[in-house]
C-alpha cells in the first residue's frame, strides 16, 4: 500500500501541475489582458498566492472531493485505490490536452466527471448500486454549470455599464482607468488565493481517499498540491492566460475589474447557498458579459464556441477515461 501512496502522490502532483497550468487563467488572465500586470509578474504573484491558499485553506474542499460523490466507505480499499488513481490520471490527461489547445476547462468538473466514472465502473462490477452514487450532489453541480456563467456575464455587463455611465462618460477616461488598474490587481490577488484554497482539492481529494481518509488531511498532501499548482502556473500557465485574457474580447482596466468583481461575487453568493460552481466557467462568462456591454461585435464568437464545446465534453470524456483505466486496473493489477 505504501507503493500506491507514492504513486498517488506523483499522479496527484501531475494533476496539481495541470490545475496550475490551466486554471491560472481564472485569477490572473484579465489582469494580463488589460496589461495591468506583465506575464512574469502574474506568474510570480499567482504562484505564491495559489500555493498559500492551497496549503492553509484547502482541507474542507478536499473532504468533499474525497467522499462527496462516491461512497468510498462502502468499497474494498483496493477498489478505492484503483478508482482514485484512475480518476486522477483521467482528469490529468484531459486537462493536459485542453491546456495544449489553449482551452480554459473546469478542473473541478474534470475530477468530478472522473469520480463519476469511478462510481459507474464500480456499479457495473456490482460493487455498488446505482442509487448509492450521490446524484443530488451531481445535480447541484450540473445546475451550477448553467447558472454561474450566465449570472457572471449578467453581473459583469451591469457593473461595466454602470462604470461607463457614471465614470467613463463623465470624467477623463485615462485617470479613471489608472485607478482601476490597482483595483483590478487587488481583485486578481484575492481570486488567486481563493482559487488555490478551492481547486487544490481536485488533486488532493483522491489522494485522501487512497490514504483511507478519515477526517484529517495530512499537511504534506496539501503542500504537494499547492507546490504542483505553483509549478504548473510557472511552466505552462501562459497558454490559457492568453486565451481568456486577450482572445475573447479586448480588456481595459475597468473591463478587467468588472469581470473579476463579477466572478468573485458570483462564487461568493454560490458558496453561501452551498452551490459548487466553476471559477473557470464563471470568469469566462463574466469576460463575455463585459464584451457584450460594448456590443456583440466586440466578442470573438469563434473562441467562445470552442470554449463551450470543451465544457460540454469534459465530464463524459473524463468519466469514460476513468471507466477504462479502472477496469484495466481491476483486471490486470
From Swiss-Prot:
One of its GO terms (cellular component) is plasma membrane. GO terms for molecular function: phosphate transmembrane transporter activity. It is found in: Cell membrane. Its main location: membrane. It is a multi-pass membrane protein. The chain crosses the membrane at residues 1-21, 37-57, 79-99, 103-123, 143-163, 217-237, 284-304, 312-332. Keywords: Cell membrane, Membrane, Phosphate transport, Transmembrane, Transmembrane helix, Transport. Disulfide bonds: none annotated. GO terms for biological process: phosphate ion transmembrane transport. It comes from the Archaea. Potential transporter for phosphate. Belongs to the inorganic phosphate transporter (PiT) (TC 2.A.20) family. This is Putative phosphate permease AF_1798.
Amino acid at each position: 500500500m505504501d507503493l500506491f501512496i507514492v504513486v498517488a502522490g506523483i499522479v496527484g502532483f501531475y494533476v496539481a501541475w495541470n490545475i496550475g497550468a490551466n486554471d491560472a487563467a481564472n485569477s490572473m488572465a484579465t489582469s494580463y489582458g488589460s496589461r495591468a500586470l506583465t506575464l512574469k509578474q502574474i506568474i510570480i504573484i499567482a504562484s505564491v498566492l495559489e500555493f498559500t491558499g492551497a496549503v492553509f485553506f484547502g482541507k474542507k474542499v478536499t473532504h468533499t472531493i474525497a467522499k462527496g460523490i462516491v461512497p468510498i466507505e462502502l468499497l474494498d480499499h483496493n477498489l478505492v485505490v484503483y478508482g482514485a488513481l484512475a480518476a486522477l490520471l483521467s482528469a490529468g490527461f484531459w486537462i493536459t490536452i485542453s491546456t495544449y489547445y489553449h482551452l480554459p476547462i473546469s478542473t473541478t468538473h474534470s475530477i468530478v466527471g472522473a469520480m463519476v466514472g469511478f462510481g459507474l465502473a464500480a456499479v457495473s462490477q456490482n460493487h455498488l448500486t446505482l442509487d448509492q452514487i450521490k446524484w443530488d450532489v451531481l445535480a447541484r453541480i450540473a445546475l451550477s454549470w448553467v447558472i454561474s456563467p450566465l449570472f457572471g456575464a449578467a453581473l459583469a455587463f451591469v457593473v461595466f455599464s454602470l462604470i461607463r455611465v457614471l465614470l467613463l462618460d463623465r470624467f477623463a477616461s485615462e485617470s479613471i482607468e489608472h485607478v482601476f488598474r490597482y483595483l483590478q490587481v487587488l481583485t486578481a490577488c484575492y481570486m488567486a488565493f481563493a482559487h488555490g484554497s478551492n481547486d487544490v482539492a481536485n488533486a488532493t481529494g483522491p489522494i485522501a481517499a487512497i490514504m483511507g481518509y478519515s477526517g484529517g488531511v495530512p499537511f504534506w498532501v496539501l503542500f504537494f498540491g499547492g507546490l504542483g499548482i505553483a509549478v504548473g502556473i510557472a511552466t505552462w500557465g501562459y497558454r490559457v492566460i492568453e486565451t481568456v485574457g486577450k482572445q475573447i474580447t479586448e480588456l481595459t482596466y475597468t473591463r478587467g475589474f468588472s469581470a473579476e468583481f463579477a466572478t468573485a461575487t458570483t462564487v461568493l453568493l454560490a458558496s453561501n447557498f452551498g452551490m459548487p460552481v466553476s471559477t473557470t466557467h464563471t470568469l469566462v462568462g463574466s469576460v463575455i458579459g463585459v464584451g457584450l456591454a460594448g456590443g456583440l461585435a466586440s466578442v470573438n464568437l469563434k473562441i467562445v464556441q470552442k470554449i463551450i464545446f470543451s465544457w460540454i465534453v469534459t465530464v463524459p470524456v473524463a468519466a469514460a477515461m476513468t471507466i477504462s483505466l479502472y477496469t484495466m486496473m481491476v483486471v490486470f493489477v
